[in-house]
Amino acid sequence: MASRFPKFSQGLSQDPTTRRIWFGIATAHDFESHDGITEEKLYQKIFASHFGQLAVIFLWTSGNLFHVAWQGNFEAWSQDPLHVRPIAHAIWDPHFGQPAVEAFTRGGASGPVNISYSGVYQWWYTQGIRTNLELYQGALFLLGLAAVSLAAGWLHLQPKWQPKISWFKNAESRLNHHLSGLFGVSSLAWSGHLVHVAIPESRGQHVGWDNLLTTLPHPAGLAPFFSGQWSVYSQNPDSASHLFSTSQGSGTAILTFLGGFHPQTQSLWLTDIAHHHLAIAVLFIIAGHQYRTNFGIGHSIREILESHVPPGGGLGQGHKGLYDTLNNSLHFQLGLALASLGVITSLVAQHMYSLPSYAFIAQDFTTQAALYTHHQYIAGFIMSGAFAHGAIFFIRDYNPEQNKGNVLARMLEHKEAIISHLSWASLFLGFHTLGLYVHNDVVQAFGNPEKQILIEPVFAQWIQSSHGKTLYGFDVFLSSTASPAFYAGQSLWLPGWLDSINSNTNSLFLTIGPGDFLVHHAIALGLHTTTLILVKGALDARGSKLMPDKKEFGYSFPCDGPGRGGTCDISAWDAFYLAIFWMLNTIGWVTFYWHWKHLALWQGNAAQFNESSTYLMGWLRDYLWLNSSQLINGYNPFGMNSLSVWAWMFLFGHLIWATGFMFLISWRGYWQELIETLAWAHERTPLANLVRWKDKPVALSIVQARLVGLAHFSVGYIFTYAAFLIASTSGKFG
């Protein structure tokens, strides 16, 4: 008999119902649960799959380069980045009538095209690409890397080339290689690329493979480097009148500390960026030589952790036992990696708009909005995943004997205090913030706006002032002309910083008031509630007062039947599931805030945000309703326009989102009865009953239906907001 899906589980493949298919898909990546798995095989499978992941990434980026080179207008755009709209790719759609063809033919194209809102044009332009040929070469190179990655993945699945488990558990070697090789050398390479290729290109001098080795990036060559006169490299920077990509107003410096933005491109100085990456490279290359490997010198991570015991004895065993716990648990490692990556992704969102590093991207408002929103949503999912794997660690990998009295054990011992404090913080934030908003709504509705409770964010304003923002009149640190730091800053470090922080043409340290104070606390409510659910899910994953043996039930279970009342909805998976709704809710508030504040600033109408954001009806009416008007006016006498596709996506996103509730607010019995009725009718319908199926159709399990509901909710939520964001921004600014 032919083997049936899933091959990795003999038991599941013999299941006579459709459960076989869904459970097979659900556990396909849970390698730990597969038949015949050993620890070594587990590590080897994951290792090989990383090469597949790299191949997908290289193929995807290659496709971006290829389609822009083939169907885009990169060369025309780079002649006039502020007025030509960048084209992502052509649209081939046989259903397009003449009005649609006209509506979507833009950016100087001869037929319908999509406009690029990803920022890749600005990114490629900044790093020195100027021609379609260079884009094609990049696409080909990345295609080659994808092929190499696939070959490496296949190779590392062959018995002869599979690394041993001791290699995977060699923490010091891995850390050294990642610090020095991954971060250090790649930062050095990027700094080198900026100095040798991007900076000359920004000054109108093309550097290609033909003249790379003969063109000096700095007139003094390497002499100042070897003689220790490194400051020579920072002398004669580009002037404030420099025109990007030309020699007009350009200097010769390659490593600077100017601060602020290039006046024309409104992006960070390339010479500052090169300096930053060189410094990072030096630090990380040194850091990658800290840990003890073959030569018997350097730190042992085990020794560091074992000796981290707090003095006095009042805080337990500190980090004792953590080395083996961490080094033997992939879920622990993944949890830490996801937590770090999630924070970094959110920081990317915050820094891409406040300190834009790509030329002219700050003036492409739709791209700025899209990139901020994209990175914040990604960060939300990644951070939630960190807690999910933290919970799985506690269920599958945590050994109480190994961790007696250390920080992990102590976290579990006083989890009630942690959870109740988080709960208190969430309740406090929720009631007070909502109370203020609702009060303001009521007095607005009764025609007494002067009775609103408006609180100035004085502490945040003070922090902004200490960084040099003079608007609030605090006269402290960098905003005080009497401060030594202020004087040093004029010439010694970051002379351009104070000009930038006090300029109204960028998003650096935006002016804040009562509306910001309120929405800040609304976001804090969302963050604390999401964290509460995730932390409780992880800390209660092994057991709780209600269900002390929860660990035996695994990560996801619906209930333990009627004999133990109240054991439904308390698995670690349920906490994760609930937290995702709160996470989406929170990121929604974050992106609403960012977008509305920037729309007001970009339109030169900051008062709109300041006056309407202090009460809920202001958000609903002046942000959501006002900006979705172009998407919900349906058919009009003017016919098709370039926002029509977003209007359709806005509608379709709502549909997907609403479909989620069908799975979330109906129970299994309903579906089972419906399925049986449909199957009964099918078997008795002529012609239809010629089609048979082997598996008995059964309803999704409770956990599966929740997952399907959550997936529709999330996808619909994001699609709807993406369409709203791009249409409302591009409709105003192009």
From Swiss-Prot:
Topological category with respect to the lipid bilayer: Multi-pass membrane protein
Gene: psaB
Name of this chain's protein: Photosystem I P700 chlorophyll a apoprotein A2
Subunit field text: The PsaA/B heterodimer binds the P700 chlorophyll special pair and subsequent electron acceptors. PSI consists of a core antenna complex that captures photons, and an electron transfer chain that converts photonic excitation into a charge separation. The eukaryotic PSI reaction center is composed of at least 11 subunits.
Enzyme category, top tier: oxidoreductase
Coiled-coil stretches noted in the UniProt entry, renumbered to this chain: none
GO terms for cellular component: chloroplast thylakoid membrane; photosystem I
EC number from the UniProt entry: 1.97.1.12
